[in-house]
Amino acid sequence: MEWHKLTDRTGYVSIGNAFVPGYFLTEDELVLIDSGPMKSTRLMEMLDERHWKVRAVILTHVHIDHVANNALLLEKFPDIVFYASQEEADAIASPENMIRDMGFDTVEHAKQTQAIFYPENIHIKGIDMKQSRIQIDDEVFQLISLPGHSVGHTGVVTPDGICCIGDAIVSEDVLRVSKLPYMAYVKEALMSMEKVAELPYETYVIAHQSVERKVDISKIVRDNIAKEHQLSQIACEMLTKPMTKDEVLAKYMKTLHINQRAGIEMVIIVHNAWTRYIDLINQGKIECRDGLLYRKDRADEEGS
């Protein structure tokens, strides 16, 4: 496994489909930004070989593809500290919260995921975003509120100015192949994308899988926003007649070539699709009456 240097103190490793950044507090002690999308024995081996100690992990958010090595890191470094925004920490505090904030459909599914990725022995310290900073030793990590992809998604700026924006946007390569980028709250996600475009930093680490300079970030943001507007338009166009939630979601996912399958992953995908309709309802473009969804520009005609 290779450590890719961005500055003297900040770099990243590539795990699966994600970059995991880190900042060195000393020559051999570092803070990671997220812990990766899959358990990585290679990461643990690299830490052993180089005699590096991970003092803390600052989570941009608590989706399972950003916390997969938390348990291994805790086993290796029992005094490690995990941080996330208070909203993210609260989102996994109970199965009921996971249903409310993370798209799970049942307590059983939430408990299954909680047992694997958010066990009781891993305590995530919630940070009040009014504070917007974490100090570790004499080093300060700035936090940027970027909700939308998740309830309390956060950007993390290392003490030397590298801006790690998690999943607030995705790279151009990922955007080209992604059928339905995950959004918990569409309106907030779009506002956060616009916020990213206005940030002053020179270097940005996008979790799935890109390092970009300030000069390029505005175009990537515009492309992410355009993709979301396209997906919203397609969602609206599915309602050629009054339809139930299940009917329109099945049609939407078929149009996007998303194959239906069993399992928790599909539960989250369906919720991801439904967030587009929640946003359209909030915009007043769609309304729900008697268990049916109507396009507002056709609702009067269809209801008469």
Predicted regions and their residues:
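C-terminal regulatory/interaction regions
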Residues: 237-304
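Active-site neighborhood of phospho(di)ester-bond hydrolases with catalytic His/Asp-centered motifs
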Residues: 32-36, 55-63, 83-86, 145-148, ...
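Aromatic/hydrophobic pocket-lining residues that form the small-molecule binding cavity
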Residues: 67, 189, 273
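Metallo-beta-lactamase
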Residues: 140-229
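Active-site HxH/HxHxD metal-binding segment of metal-dependent hydrolases
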Residues: 39, 45-133
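A short catalytic or substrate-binding loop motif that flags glycine-/basic-rich loops and adjacent residues
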Residues: 15-18, 128, 147-150
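Conserved beta-strand hairpin/beta-sheet module of binuclear metal-dependent hydrolase folds
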Residues: 1-50, 155-166
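Pre-recognition alpha-helix immediately N-terminal to the DNA-recognition helix
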Residues: 230-238
